Amino acid sequence: MALPNKVKKLLSDAEQLSDYRDCSSYFYKWLFNEFSKQPVGNLINARAEFIDRLLIKLFHVYDLAHEPDLALIAVGGYGRGELHPYSDIDFLLLVTQQPNAEISEKIGQFVTMLWDLNLEIGHSVRTIAQAIEQKREDVTFATSLLESRLIFGNHIEFEKLKNHIIDTPVWRSNEFFLAKVQEQHLRHRKCHGTAYNLEPNIKENPGGLRDLQTIIWVAKKHFRAETLQELISHGYLTHEEFQELSECLENLWNIRFALHLAAGRSENRLLFDHQPQAAEILGFGSDGKSSVERMMKRLFRIMSRVRELNLMLLAYFEQSISPKHHQPIIQELDRNFERIGNQIKVKSPSVFFRRDQLFMLFEHIADNPEITHIYPSTIRTIRQVRRRLLGDLQDYAACREAFLRLIKHPNGMGRAFTLMHKHGMLAAYLPQWRNIFGQMQFDLFHAYTVDEHTHRLINNIYQYFDKTGVSEFPICSEIVTRMDKPELLYLAGIFHDIAKGRGGDHSELGAVDALAFAKLHAFSVADGKLIAWLVSNHLLMSVTAQRKDINDPGVIKDFATRVKTERQLDYLYCLTVADIRATNDNLWNDWKNTLLRELYLHTQHALRLGLENPMDQRDQIRDKKHQAKQRLLNLGYMEDQIDLIWSRFKANYFTAFSEQQISWHSQHLVNSEDLSQPSVIVSNKAMHGGTQVFVYSPYSGPLFARLVSVIGSKKAQIQHAQVLTTKDGYVLFNFVILEVNGEPIASGRAQSIKRALEQALFEPRKKIRFKKNRSQRFKDFNIKPKIVLRPHPRKDRSLIEIQAIDIPGLLTKIAEVFQAHLLHIHAARITTVGQRAEDFFVVSNNEYQALTDEEQAKIHQALRKKLNAETE
């Protein structure tokens, strides 16, 4: 489109730096204002034209326009004439020979002026020989030259370069193709193979702009096609596919343009911070999450279409471009399908007139591990059939039978399920799946859309049957080998989050959907109830393990009562492990593995005893004491030494800790020279999966605040904390701490933390400093702390429950409020679930009494003020 006359005049008249800046400012205001009025393609072309005119003007200003041996060439996106508001400007200065000092100085002044105008530029000065040599070594540079465009100067040299680019054998067509495919593969792998993470990169993610550009680059190199449309005449694209790709390209451009406006800079990642403003700019509204959901759902669906078309076209290109040293093996699978190499092909599009044959294709994939891909013509046929479907595939009895065969197949939920997900067959079968496709999740846990999270969960369950699963998840692997109906576990996984985004309790709504599915597919009443129960309770085990004291027999009894049977416990445990691992790449760690395993084993034991014969607290204490004492006696400790230490502990100590921990604590205390003095021990052996820190000290109100501050200052994360008091006025702290990456603390670091804690105990007045380093992700969720004060079973105690974003220093802030209000902490339970802290404190006031209503109100207000200030 033509630039406004005023922009042209301002640029023509510009003399001083301030004039150029005024011209640029006017242009960008015009550009941003036009976004809601014009097709985005016009605007990105307009910016390229504006930069063309600016460079040509400055070429004249710095007396470069009269140099006969110089050509100014746009490359990359700028060469295509596509510049988003803040995109980099890449150009090549092509010279016939190395420029002399005078010309080099002029070039330097030219480039400096562009920097002074705050333009992000990428430039190089090359002879044709140098450009060809760099092209030989660097496929990225070769690709950028493929899109080169002469802006000004020596057109003869430019044409020589263009001819070399196309005809030179340096990057033969097949070599270029293989290099671009490998480049795309590595790019996708960096994104974990999915476009559906919640902060997608519009350019680099699978299905992003790069995938579209890869198609164009290969077409230019091999077919000398300048546009996608030319692929129609070459027989690679249908008119409908060209229209679809064009529509996808325009949509991605729109979102990227809006992202630049929202960020105020060049940005390709659609970060949470930018999503609300980008959604508003794009016309999705300004109603927060709803607007963002609509925008992101459209984006994810566009990226899915691009990825599928990219996959299909590159497969077609490979057939034409890559030399065949030998014919691929062709194996007939049945009368409708054949295997060609590692691809499955439908023999005739008419096969899919019988809808159940769509699932037969995936059943063959499950049957044949050699098949890793779908033949490109078959992808095209699937796409066409998918578009013409009337109703859901589950409405056809033959499809239901085929679907059930697939989920019961030993390999059906592996690659076959992944390809079904990738090619839209789950959405074609289950209407509820269409609703979660591209569905955002606004919480502090999930890194992926609902459908992608569910896909990963299913992959995790499938892994239990694999050799890697046996070593990494031995209990789950052992369970599934004796599981009578693993398909029920898979179905619970498919439905566990299927009601997200509808409002209401997604677990209960999903259970209703699961029951309806079971009825439609003729499952027995018992099987349908099990699937629905798993969906309804899929968070139960995770919540219990991470928020409650799993060493408390009462907690185990309550959990076992809800689980009811060992069979349901087995299914729930396998589902929970797979669910947490599929949530994001950082949530699962050895500590959570240990918690869930212990809860599973405790509950299994309780169920085997019988719910009518639960182990009571006295039995548990007696058993733990016996086992811990036996350990200590075997190590050479005397019984009277052990009894003397234990006589100081209340009963809750023996329920709170395992026999291994009790033994570890006791060894330390028996060996202590002076039990009137505080002490610290640290170990990675006391509990698998985390570093244990045990602190023994005379009771002091501010002590908790100091200890958690020290741990925070050492950049360790507190996963779990317990505070217990002895009968004689001492306090016991037990922390489980991890590195930021979820690993236990290394030995050297652990000793450093131990020394710092000892210093805090012996030098209580020394200030503790630590740097606040608030994660970007915390800023992206407007989640206010939840603070609840309630009575405690003991009349002289109160319970404080706090849920908040786990910001650095959170526990310190809480402890500071407690200290300011002279509260005594008698017990605490600190848990971290994802990036949310859930903390429980048993406290009393300065008179060791329960908090009065007035005290509760003051503490509630103080906590809210302190924590809101930290999360804003």
Curated annotation (Swiss-Prot):
InterPro entries noted in UniProt: ACT-like_dom_sf, ACT_dom, HD/PDEase_dom, HD_domain, NT_sf, PII_UdlTrfase/GS_AdlTrfase, Polymerase_NTP_transf_dom, UTase/UR
Positions of the HD domain: 450-572
Entry annotated with the keyword Repeat: yes
Catalysed conversion reaction: [protein-PII]-L-tyrosine + UTP = [protein-PII]-uridylyl-L-tyrosine + diphosphate; [protein-PII]-uridylyl-L-tyrosine + H2O = [protein-PII]-L-tyrosine + UMP + H(+)
Reported cofactor(s): Mg(2+)
Keywords: Hydrolase, Magnesium, Multifunctional enzyme, Nucleotidyltransferase, Repeat, Transferase
Keyword Secreted: no
Family affiliation: Belongs to the GlnD family.
Domain notes: Has four distinct domains: an N-terminal nucleotidyltransferase (NT) domain responsible for UTase activity, a central HD domain that encodes UR activity, and two C-terminal ACT domains that seem to have a role in glutamine sensing.
Chain's role: Modifies, by uridylylation and deuridylylation, the PII regulatory proteins (GlnB and homologs), in response to the nitrogen status of the cell that GlnD senses through the glutamine level. Under low glutamine levels, catalyzes the conversion of the PII proteins and UTP to PII-UMP and PPi, while under higher glutamine levels, GlnD hydrolyzes PII-UMP to PII and UMP (deuridylylation). Thus, controls uridylylation state and activity of the PII proteins, and plays an important role in the regulation of nitrogen assimilation and metabolism.
Name of the protein described by the UniProt record: Bifunctional uridylyltransferase/uridylyl-removing enzyme
Annotated organism of origin: Pseudoalteromonas translucida (strain TAC 125)
Lineage per the UniProt record: Bacteria, Pseudomonadati, Pseudomonadota, Gammaproteobacteria, Alteromonadales
Gene that specifies this protein: glnD
